[in-house]
Design a protein with these regions (language model features):
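Positively charged n-region of N-terminal signal peptides that target proteins for export
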Residues: 1-4
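Bacterial N-terminal signal peptides
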Residues: 7-16
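A short, N-terminal "cap"/entry segment at the start of jelly-roll beta-barrel domains
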Residues: 19-66, 81, 113, 147-199, ...
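Conserved short histidine dyad/triad with adjacent acidic residue
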Residues: 55-57, 70-85, 188-190, 203-218
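Short beta-strand segments in beta-sandwich/barrel cores
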Residues: 78-80, 97-102, 211-213, 230-235
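Glycine- and acidic-residue-biased ligand/ion/polar-headgroup-sensing regions
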Residues: 87-99, 220-232
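Short acidic-glycine-tyrosine-enriched beta hairpin
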Residues: 106-121, 239-254
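Ligand-binding loop in jelly-roll beta-barrel domains
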Residues: 121-147, 254-280
Length: 282
């Protein structure tokens, strides 16, 4: 993990309360509450994939759209083998270092901080670190239980979104009652998503000091804010407030409220990923 994170990392213990099977998770995890878990030779790859997780897919509920969120590290020479998921979607969002991402068409791309990748159901992907620095990335797994999996085969979608090709879309008074401007750079947005896709939107967002996203909820979508830089205050559906900083993970499932305010003196930068499981029942 990057040195900037190292001083803040605390090794936590895997407890049943944290990863209880089928139990609804909370809405906010600070860096000290992430759980460390290493995997070896993932998908036929090589070396250790080090992970620090808010929650893992093995304990997700059927109705959850976002099944897993983790900060992952590959050291020099380590790689995740080329593989595919039958019904999950898997996004790798590069935070630091340089790697090689391989897509389902056997294209290989050099990936750097700010680049975003995704594999929809049935699409192949792999990731390798051939540089001397650690390759650090977010790994977010989601599932739409009502997806027509055959539709993905007949209509493959792009998998690689370089940082310099992300498109801008800014929002005033985000969440309806927010203050200032929410600046966004997007790989894709929910307006163009299909009913089969679980991950509807991925954006790199910025709130200037004092600006905010107002308290709001999504009727059907799940929305995660994953903090990369700066300091802010996250408000959950019960009105609880949390101080969040780098490597804090927040989420609001369908029907839950959430809000975010930049309470620091520097830009608050975060990933905003929206997903939906159309099979979920109210």
């Amino acid at each position: 993990m990057k040195k900037v994170f190292a001083a803040a990392l605390i090794l936590t213990v895997m407890a049943g309360v944290c990863f209880a099977d089928g139990v609804k998770h909370g809405q906010c995890w600070t860096v000290s509450e992430l759980t460390e878990l290493d995997k070896q030779d993932v998908a036929g790859g090589k070396g250790t994939l080090h992970g620090e997780f808010a929650f893992i897919r093995d304990n997700a509920r059927d109705e959850d759209a976002i099944k897993e969120i983790g900060f992952m590290t590959l050291n020099h020479g380590a790689f995740i083998g080329l593989h595919r998921h039958s019904d999950n979607e898997d996004a790798y969002l590069i935070l630091s270092g340089t790697g090689i991402f391989t897509d389902g068409e056997d294209n290989a791309y050099v990936v750097r901080p700010g680049d975003m990748t995704i594999a929809r159901p049935g699409q192949w992907h792999g990731l390798a670190n051939l540089s001397s620095e650690e390759l650090v990335f977010l790994d977010i797994i989601a599932k739409n239980g009502a997806a027509d999996l055959e539709a993905f085969k007949s209509n493959p979608t792009p998998q690689y979104f370089p940082a310099d090709k992300l498109f801008d879309k800014n929002t005033e008074h985000a969440g309806g009652t927010g203050e200032g401007t929410l600046y966004g750079k997007f790989a894709f947005r929910r307006e163009q998503a299909t009913a089969d896709q679980a991950i509807k939107e991925i954006g790199l967002m910025t709130l200037k000091p004092g600006d905010s996203i107002g308290l709001h909820k999504h009727d059907a979508n799940e929305d995660t804010y994953i903090i990369l830089a700066g300091t802010g205050t996250f408000t959950d559906g019960d009105g609880n407030e949390y101080i969040v900083g780098p490597q804090s993970v927040t989420i609001a499932v369908a029907g839950e409220s959430h809000a975010l305010k930049n309470t620091g003196t520097e830009d608050l930068v975060f990933i905003d990923l929206i997903a939906q499981n159309h099979a979920a029942k109210d």
